[in-house]
């Protein structure tokens, strides 16, 4: 039986973030750039580059709670924007996960007793239910959520919950002022779309144009590259060619994103990442969660279109990458009364040709 494909949600750049939002309106929003927002009772991450020692700039903030879970959940991805660290690899990138209770302690305990079978919340406010994967398994299932969708919030009065947290969040924010000189990218909200909504509008002209340029540089025949990536007579076998595996991986990447080239983020909890280059042993040798020892799973990745959107608010900063693969604790563990963000893991795949995405 064929494996059930996990749904994929796409993150797109939306409106600029104006001013300095605070409270739940800030930390329940997904965004690129700006200042990292902190959940109530959890300190905002302030990482530094392991290569140069300078503060890291926030690349994206993703609000991704679980329906049925007692926790708010926030992920931050940081990078070093210093020119000398553009090729610093994992030492110049950091990922952090923060969680805090969104219901009183007694209700949280009752929710935990109901088991780990958690459905996914929608990723954006007012979004339609794009279909949760109903495949049975012991692990919770995640998607992203921008707000309080009635279909997923069910009978919980989220407005009251968030209002109760405003004062506490304001106090925490006052206790952790933004350090002067913190590198910042201009902030924009991230909106969401279902990748399936783009399937009927695929235009491969742009992908083919880029691949023709690639072919001329590498001396590779286009028909070979295409045949290596297309099914043969409807089955799962591919034609055998002399194409390098890296070229096949690259073409599959370009073909998949052709329908929505402006995507800056792909989210598919426990799904399959879209590799830009051939995966290395890092993918099969992921480090275990440092807190619970459990395994990590793929959650989302940052896409090449994001690079040109990371415009600096100061100091002329920039980052370069092909795609960033983010892996998080499968159990999304969070000890009682924990108050500091937990570090997760990311894999950096460099752009095989930076000019292709500009």
Curated annotation (Swiss-Prot):
Higher expression in lung, colon, mammary gland, cervix, stomach and small intestine. Over-expression suppresses AP1, CREB, NFAT, and NF-kB transcriptional activation, and delays cell cycle progression at S phase. One of its GO terms (biological process) is apoptotic process. This is Programmed cell death protein 2-like. The modification Phosphoserine is found at residue 20. Keywords: Acetylation, Cell cycle, Phosphoprotein. GO terms for cellular component: cytoplasm; membrane. PANTHER family: PROGRAMMED CELL DEATH PROTEIN 2-LIKE. The modification Phosphothreonine is found at residue 22. The modification N-acetylalanine is found at residue 2. It holds the Pfam family PDCD2_C.
């Amino acid at each position: 039986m064929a494996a059930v494909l996990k749904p994929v949600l796409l993150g797109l750049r939306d409106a600029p973030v104006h001013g300095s939002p605070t409270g739940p309106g800030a930390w329940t929003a997904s965004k690129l750039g700006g200042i990292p927002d902190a959940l109530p009772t959890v300190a905002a991450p302030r990482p530094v580059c392991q290569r140069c020692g300078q503060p890291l700039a926030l690349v994206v903030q993703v609000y991704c709670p679980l329906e049925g879970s007692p926790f708010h959940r926030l992920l931050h991805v940081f990078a070093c924007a210093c020119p000398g660290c553009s090729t610093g690899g994992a030492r110049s990138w950091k990922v952090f996960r923060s969680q805090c209770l969104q219901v009183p302690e007694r209700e949280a305990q009752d929710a935990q007793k109901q088991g780990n079978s958690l459905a996914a919340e929608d990723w954006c406010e007012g979004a339609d239910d794009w279909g949760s994967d109903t495949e049975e398994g012991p692990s919770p299932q995640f998607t992203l959520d921008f707000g309080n969708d009635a279909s997923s919030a069910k009978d919980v009065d989220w407005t009251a919950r968030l209002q109760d947290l405003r004062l506490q969040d304001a106090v925490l924010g006052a206790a952790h002022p933004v350090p002067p000189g913190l590198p910042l990218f201009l902030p924009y909200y991230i909106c969401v779309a279902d990748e399936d909504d783009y399937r009927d509008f695929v235009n491969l002209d742009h992908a083919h144009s880029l691949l023709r340029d690639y072919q001329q540089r590498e001396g590779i025949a286009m028909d070979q590259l295409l045949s290596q990536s297309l099914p043969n007579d409807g089955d799962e076998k591919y034609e055998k060619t002399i194409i390098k595996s890296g070229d096949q991986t690259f073409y599959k990447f370009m073909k998949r994103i052709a329908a929505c080239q402006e995507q800056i983020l792909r989210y598919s909890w426990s799904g399959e990442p879209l590799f830009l280059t051939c995966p290395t042993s890092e993918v099969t040798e992921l480090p275990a969660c440092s807190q619970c020892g459990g395994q990590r799973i793929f959650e989302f990745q940052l896409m090449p279109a994001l690079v040109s959107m990371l415009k600096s608010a100061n100091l002329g900063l920039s980052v370069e990458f092909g795609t960033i693969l983010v892996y998080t604790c499968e159990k999304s563990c969070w000890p009682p009364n924990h108050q500091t963000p937990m570090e997760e893991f990311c894999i950096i795949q460099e752009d095989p040709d930076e000019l292709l995405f500009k």
